[in-house]
Each structure stands twice: as structure tokens, then as C-alpha cells.
């Protein structure tokens, strides 16, 4: 994931006095020039030759930081003096960044224990006990510690980039405003003894997560630019719904015959009801319910609903998916372009600062500009760079191959192409045996068909379990005969154990563990064997003589059920053996690895809507005062907003779905995002509160189900298409290696325009703290 860039906005050429303190390498512009950078850093042949030894470590330190910036796609526009670079590296160290991430997680998790607390075993408002409420000052104390850490965070960022750049960075200014607002709201809470009804800071807490990720900010920017195209389709959808609403109200108008008023009474009674009915039909959540009253009178009425669904659900909604895919892919490509430029710029900056004369270099004397870097100096830098060990080894290995001992600018850039590649583990060689028997075992159990046989045995085991489950489906735990099931399990587990041991003999211990499939199989086999031994020791043999005490029977059944679940789970070993399934599994892994930013923004949206839902609807739905798990028929005589009609909130017993605490709010929002029966929630909250509550749910549906789900589908298509195209012509064993180049940047590499050397040098000239002159 890209880390937070210290400068995302434009660069002010007249920024203040931030730079290196080594006077031998300083470049002094005209002192009469307003806002000149008197301490800006420059590299010139004469000055660097004077105090070469004193400045050598600074140059190396600068190159190290610039390379680390390139690795993480960070901006290089920060201070470059020795003290600032040490602070900068400490700030972006794993310890500091993990600490900041933990702080963000803690401040977001406070919503689960703050009032209204989610610390109950159930969210069903009929039986929900009174939750534990933290004493006043407990969560506030944790929160103020987190806010102090955020203050230190924004202070460090402001110092490292300088005030001129800080005030032009909208994200950092917003960060400062959010911290200030949170502190003020926190002080109000303390002054009111935690008895306030509204905590504004809860709504803006997700900003801390958002601002800490460069990828999230880029994704949000892409979504913002895609909104106009999405809005045009939403407007067309609104026109489509309104048009069919008016036609529907004309077709299904109230008749003098009460028997023909079923459609009007239920779905087209008034304009808001008709609009909401067709909006829900657009998501197919109430299909064919909305059509049945009219369809039962005349089959011709079905044409109206079919036309509405065809044009709305299947044309316009899929058109929106296509637009989101097309537009967002373009903007994501622009974001990737920016990331590539940052990487190239950071690497070029490292090359330039290492080109100071006098430290193992060559230069073009006609121009006085250094063109090459000594390999020895480069290796010294690479020893101090924090990066993945396999990338470092690959880069160092490639650098040692230069015959003349020098690296040009183009070769310097090319060395770091290894950063885009994931590590592909090489399997260790098989052990050599002198015994013919062991050699025969090695030949047989290292063959591909042994894996096929193992998959067939696993399939047979699953089929046996399914057969037993079908035969015992109607039996209780005390009625089941566990003897035959355990005999079957023991036979298969014994085969799994023998297979594992012989594979270890064939591949060797290290070779066996070098395959992820073997690790998966071996772990489950050992676990199954351990559970089976526990069953033998605890319940003895035969199982038909198990003590009929229900407690013992249930304990045995639970352990056997655990064994069966592990055996079924072990059957997932077939996924890497089938090419299409391997590609799908690889796509899922890449989505988790590369698209975390999208999940992060979805978390932000969920968090904000959950807090807003608590504000608007907390306690809105409540069961009858004398209700305690009463039957459905007892509600029929109760007046008020309650309804026991078929398909209503009360009849379906959706009581656990509410906005009475943060955890239940998240679950309710998820249920609405899935859109199955989401009209049940909108109808209930409209009855218990007001019809305007529909606005909240429609906005959530548009945000989550329409925009975000379509966006996620589009990105899955892009990722899968990329993987599938690269997998054509590969064998099953090679599919796993597709992940060797699987970053988002490389997905769009062929469409990205590489920056030219002139463009990179021009941007380096605009660096606010590093003034390079040739």
C-alpha cells in the first residue's frame, strides 16, 4: 500500500528556509530575491570537492531516503538536512506506522463501547439485556490520548514539509481541522459529564483512517471524478422510475369494485408508495410480489412490470456498471501514472545526489554534469535501505554485473524494476538416496498423479460424509450411530498420514514445506490425527457403548462434527490443481492484497452511515411494552405502527435489525446493501418514524449497492481479465507464478506512459528543499 505522501499539492518555488546545513554544498540565490531559499541544497562540482568527506554521509542518507520514498510511492518533497532525514525515517519506520495504525484502530473501535454500547450477546430488542456502559471519562481518556498522537502526527508532517507546503496541502489542513473539532467536541463532552446527546467527533473519526493512506485518497479522488457520469445514469434511472410511476398510477387507479383494488391498495395507493414500490422492484427485492395482485386479475398487466424491469434492472443498471468500469478505470490509470512518476522521480533523485564529484564517478567535462554512479557507492546505499530482502538481493546482484563498475542513469532506473515483482520461492532440490526402495518411493510420490490420487481420495471422503449426513439428517445426536462414521474417518485419516510421511521422504522436510499445498495438507492431517487420538482416549472403543448420558453424547458428536468439518475443509486442496479455479483463487488473493484501499473507503462509508443512523433512528422501533417473546398472533390486536401483515418487519421477526447500537447498525446496513428484503426495513422505519426516513435508506442503497458494488465488480473484472489473459498457454503448475507481477501498477503498466528524463529533471528543479544545479 502506498504511504501518506508529505506533499500532494503544487510546489511553491519560494518556500522558506528548509534544507541541508552543510555549507559546502549550499547554493545561495540572489539575497535580494523575495522569499529566496537561502538554505536550499545544491550540488556543484567545485563546492562538493572541498568537503567531500564531510558531506559523503549526507549524500548517502539522502539517496537512501529517496529510494525508500520510491519504494513506497511517497513524495520526495520534504526536508533533506541530516536531522530532518533521521526524523523522516523514524516517522516512516514500521514501529511508528504500526503505532499510528493501531491508534486509528483504537479510536474507531471506541464506537462499540461508547453509549449506546454494543456489549451484549444479542441485538434483539425483545430480549436484549441492558448493556454495560463505561464510566464517564474512560473512553474519553483513551480518545484524548489518541488525539494527542494525531496532534504529534500532523506536527511532524508539518515540520518535515515546511509551512509553505503545509498550507497548500488540503488533506493536511483538513486533518488539522478535524483534530481541532474533535478536541473541542471532547471538551464539551467532559464539561457535560458525558451526558451529551450528539457527539460530532464520532461522525468525523473515519477521516483519520482516510488521510493515513495515499491509495485511499487517490481512490476517493477517482470516485469523485466519476460521479458526474454516475449522476447522469442515476438521473436517467430517476426519470425511468417517475415515468413508470405515473403510468402505474393511471393503470392501477382506484376502482369502484373493491376486488380490483388489490394492486392500488398495496403498492400504488399514493405517489410516495408507488415510487418506493417501483424503486424496490428495480432491485428485484419485491419481485414478483408487486405484480401478483394485478397479474391475478389480468395477465396483460405483467407487460408493465416486465418492461419496467427490462429497461431499469437489466439495461440501465448494467449500463451504470459499464460506465463505472470504463470511467473509473481511466481515473485509476491516472492515479497509477502518478505513482509511477513518484517512483521514477525518487530513484532519479537518489541518482542525482549520488553523482556529486569526487566519490567514484565519471562526468561529462564539457557540461560538468555527472552521468554515472560508482557501483561501490550504490552498494553502500543499498545496505542501508529498508526494503524486502529478496528485492535487495536481486538489485545488488544486477548491480555487480556492470563490468566497468559504474551505473548510468538509465541503468539505475532499470535496476529498480525488481520492486514491482513478488517473490517466487524456488523449491529446494530433492534428497538423494542410495537405497533403491527409497528411490522408488521418491519417484512415485513426487509424481503428479499422486496429487490426483490424493484429490480423488479426498473427494471420496467428502462423499462418504455427505452420505452419512443425508442418512442421519432426521436423527438427533443421541440416536446417531457414530461407530461407522468413525471407522470411515480413521481409514481416511490413516491414508492422509501415510501420504504426508511418504511425501516428506520424497521431497525432504524443506522441500515438503516449500509447497503451500503440502503445508495446508500437513497441518490439517496432524490436527485430524490429534483430534482422533483424543476421541479414542476419551470415549474408548467401541462407540456403540458410549455412555448414553446426553452430556457425553453431545461431546462426542461435537468432536466428530469438528473432524468432518476439517475433512471437508481439506478438500479445498483441489483448487490449485484446476487451472480456472487457480486463476479465480489467485484473483481473490490479489484483490485482498492490491485493493485494500477500496475496502478502507467502504469501511469509512459504513462507519459514517452507522453513526448517522444511530442519531436518526436509535430507539425508533420498539416492541410492545408487555412483549417478551410473544407469539405472532398476540400482536394482531395491538394498535399503533405495528403490523402483522405477511412480509412485514414484525411478522418476519426482524427485531435484531435496528440502529440501537453501533454493531447492530453495521449489520442492518449490510442487510440493506444486499438488497434482499430491504424494503421491509424501509417500510418499518417509515411507519415508526416518518416517510422522510426513506431518503436515508435510498442514499445508502445508491452509495453501497449501486456505486460501490458496481465499482468492486468492475475492478474484479479488470483483475480477473488481466490474470486470465496472462494464464493462457500456461500449465497448472505455472498459474501460481502469475502473481509474480500482480500489483495494481503492473496491471496497467502497458497503458502507462513512462516519464522522460527531461520531465524528471524539471520536477527535481522544483523541489522546495533540494536545489540541484548543474
UniProtKB/Swiss-Prot annotation:
One Pfam family from the record: Ion_trans
Region (Interaction with phosphatidylinositol 3,5-bisphosphate) location: 217-221
Membrane disposition: Multi-pass membrane protein
Mod. after translation: N-glycosylated.
Cellular localization per UniProt: Late endosome membrane; Lysosome membrane
Catalytic activity: Na(+)(in) = Na(+)(out); Ca(2+)(in) = Ca(2+)(out)
GO BP: any one term: endocytosis involved in viral entry into host cell
Glycan attachment residues as annotated in the record: 626, 632, 637
Cytoplasmic side: 1-92, 162-170, 219-232, 324-452, 508-518, 586-596, 718-774
Intramembrane positions: 268-292, 659-681
Keywords: Calcium, Calcium channel, Calcium transport, Endosome, Glycoprotein, Ion channel, Ion transport, Lysosome, Membrane, Repeat, Transmembrane, Transmembrane helix, Transport, Voltage-gated channel
Side Extracellular, residues: 114-140, 192-197, 254-267, 293-302, 476-486, 540-564, 618-658, 682-696
Residues of the signal peptide: none
Gene Ontology cellular component terms for the protein in this record: late endosome membrane; lysosomal membrane; lysosome; monoatomic ion channel complex
Gene3D superfamilies (UniProt xref): 1.10.287.70, Voltage-gated potassium channels. Chain C (1.20.120.350)
Domain of life of the source: Eukaryota
GO molecular function, one term: NAADP-sensitive calcium-release channel activity
Role according to the record: Intracellular channel initially characterized as a non-selective Ca(2+)-permeable channel activated by NAADP (nicotinic acid adenine dinucleotide phosphate), it is also a highly-selective Na(+) channel activated directly by PI(3,5)P2 (phosphatidylinositol 3,5-bisphosphate). Localizes to the lysosomal and late endosome membranes where it regulates organellar membrane excitability, membrane trafficking, and pH homeostasis.
Assembly behavior: Homodimer.
Name the UniProt record assigns to this protein: Two pore channel protein 2
Organism phylogeny: Eukaryota, Metazoa, Chordata, Craniata, Vertebrata
Amino acid at each position: 500500500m502506498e504511504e501518506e505522501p508529505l506533499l500532494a499539492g503544487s510546489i511553491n518555488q519560494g518556500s522558506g528556509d528548509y534544507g541541508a546545513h552543510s555549507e559546502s554544498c549550499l547554493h545561495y540565490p540572489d539575497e535580494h530575491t523575495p522569499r529566496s531559499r537561502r538554505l536550499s541544497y545544491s550540488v556543484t562540482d567545485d563546492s562538493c570537492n572541498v568537503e567531500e568527506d564531510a558531506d559523503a554521509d549526507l549524500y548517502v542518507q539522502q539517496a537512501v531516503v529517496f529510494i525508500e520514498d520510491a519504494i513506497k510511492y511517497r513524495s520526495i518533497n520534504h526536508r533533506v538536512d541530516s536531522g530532518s532525514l533521521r526524523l523522516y525515517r523514524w516517522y516512516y519506520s514500521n514501529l511508528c506506522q504500526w503505532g499510528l495504525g493501531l491508534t486509528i484502530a483504537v479510536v474507531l473501535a471506541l464506537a462499540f463501547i461508547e453509549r449506546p454500547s454494543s456489549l451484549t450477546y444479542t441485538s434483539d430488542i425483545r430480549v436484549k439485556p441492558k448493556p454495560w456502559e463505561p464510566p464517564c471519562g474512560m473512553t474519553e481518556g483513551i480518545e484524548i490520548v489518541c488525539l494527542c498522537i494525531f496532534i504529534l502526527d500532523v506536527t511532524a508532517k508539518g515540520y518535515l514539509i515546511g509551512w509553505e507546503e503545509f498550507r497548500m496541502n488540503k488533506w493536511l489542513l483538513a486533518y488539522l481541522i478535524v483534530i481541532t473539532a474533535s478536541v473541542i467536541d471532547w471538551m464539551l463532552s467532559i464539561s457535560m459529564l458525558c451526558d451529551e446527546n450528539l457527539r460530532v467527533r464520532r461522525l468525523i473519526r473515519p477521516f483519520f483512517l482516510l488521510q493515513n493512506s495515499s491509495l485511499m485518497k487517490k481512490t476517493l479522488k477517482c470516485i469523485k471524478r466519476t460521479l458526474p457520469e454516475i449522476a447522469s445514469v442515476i438521473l436517467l434511472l430517476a426519470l425511468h422510475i417517475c415515468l413508470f410511476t405515473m403510468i402505474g398510477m393511471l393503470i392501477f387507479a382506484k376502482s369502484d369494485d373493491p376486488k380490483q383494488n388489490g394492486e392500488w391498495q398495496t403498492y400504488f395507493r399514493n405517489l410516495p408508495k408507488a415510487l418506493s414500490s417501483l424503486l424496490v422492484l428495480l432491485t428485484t427485492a419485491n419481485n414478483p410480489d408487486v405484480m401478483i395482485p394485478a397479474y391475478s386479475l389480468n395477465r396483460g398487466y405483467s407487460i408493465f412490470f416486465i418492461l419496467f424491469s427490462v429497461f431499469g434492472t437489466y439495461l440501465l443498471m448494467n449500463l451504470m456498471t459499464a460506465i463505472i468500469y470504463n470511467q473509473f478505470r481511466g481515473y485509476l490509470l491516472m492515479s497509477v501514472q502518478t505513482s509511477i512518476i513518484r517512483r521514477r522521480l525518487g530513484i532519479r533523485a537518489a541518482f542525482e545526489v549520488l553523482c556529486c564529484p569526487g566519490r567514484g564517478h565519471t562526468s561529462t567535462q564539457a557540461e560538468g554534469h555527472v552521468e554515472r554512479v560508482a557501483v561501490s557507492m550504490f552498494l553502500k546505499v543499498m545496505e542501508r535501505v529498508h526494503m524486502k530482502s529478496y528485492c535487495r538481493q536481486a538489485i545488488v546482484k544486477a548491480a555487480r554485473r556492470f563490468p566497468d563498475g559504474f551505473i548510468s542513469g538509465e541503468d539505475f532506473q532499470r535496476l529498480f524494476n525488481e520492486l514491482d515483482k513478488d517473490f517466487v520461492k524456488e523449491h529446494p532440490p530433492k534428497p538423494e538416496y542410495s537405497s533403491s526402495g527409497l528411490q522408488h518411493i521418491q519417484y512415485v510420490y513426487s509424481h503428479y498423479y499422486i496429487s490426483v490420487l490424493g484429490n480423488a481420495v479426498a473427494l471420496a471422503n467428502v462423499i462418504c460424509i455427505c452420505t452419512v449426513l443425508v442418512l442421519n439428517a432426521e436423527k438427533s445426536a443421541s440416536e446417531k450411530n457414530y461407530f461407522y462414521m468413525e471407522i470411515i474417518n480413521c481409514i481416511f485419516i490413516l491414508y492422509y498420514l501415510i501420504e504426508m510421511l511418504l511425501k516428506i521422504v520424497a521431497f525432504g522436510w524443506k522441500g515438503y514445506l516449500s509447497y503451500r499445498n503440502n503445508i495446508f495438507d500437513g497441518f490439517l492431517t496432524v490436527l485430524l490425527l490429534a483430534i482422533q487420538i483424543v476421541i479414542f482416549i476419551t470415549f474408548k472403543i467401541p462407540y456403540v457403548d458410549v455412555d448414553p448420558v446426553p452430556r457425553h453424547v453431545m461431546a462426542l458428536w461435537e468432536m466428530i462434527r469438528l473432524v468432518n468439518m476439517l475433512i471437508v475443509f481439506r478438500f479445498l486442496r483441489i483448487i490449485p490443481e484446476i487451472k480456472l479455479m487457480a486463476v479465480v483463487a489467485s484473483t481473490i488473493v490479489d484483490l485482498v492484497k492490491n485493493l485494500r484501499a477500496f475496502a478502507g473507503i467502504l469501511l469509512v462509508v459504513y462507519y459514517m452511515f452507522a453513526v448517522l443512523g444511530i442519531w436518526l433512528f436509535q430507539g425508533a422501533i420498539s416492541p410492545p411494552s408487555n412483549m417478551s417473546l410473544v407469539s405472532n398472533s398476540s400482536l394482531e390486536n395491538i394498535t399503533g405502527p405495528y403490523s402483522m401483515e405477511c412480509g412485514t418487519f414484525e411478522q418476519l421477526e426482524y427485531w435484531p435489525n435496528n440502529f440501537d447500537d453501533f454493531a447492530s447498525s453495521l449489520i442492518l446496513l449490510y442487510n440493506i446493501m444486499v438488497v434482499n428484503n430491504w424494503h421491509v426495513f424501509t417500510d418499518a422505519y417509515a411507519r415508526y418514524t416518518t416517510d422522510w426516513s426513506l431518503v436515508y435508506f435510498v442514499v445508502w442503497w445508491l452509495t453501497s449497492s449501486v456505486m460501490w458494488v458496481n465499482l468492486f465488480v468492475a475492478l474484479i473484472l479488470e483483475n480477473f481479465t488481466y490474470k486470465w489473459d496472462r494464464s493462457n498457454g500456461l500449465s497448472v503448475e505455472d498459474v501460481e507464478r502469475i502473481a509474480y507481477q500482480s500489483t495494481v501498477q503492473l496491471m496497467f503498466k502497458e497503458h502507462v506512459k513512462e516519464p522522460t528524463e527531461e520531465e524528471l529533471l524539471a520536477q527535481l528543479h522544483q523541489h522546495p528543499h533540494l536545489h540541484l544545479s548543474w
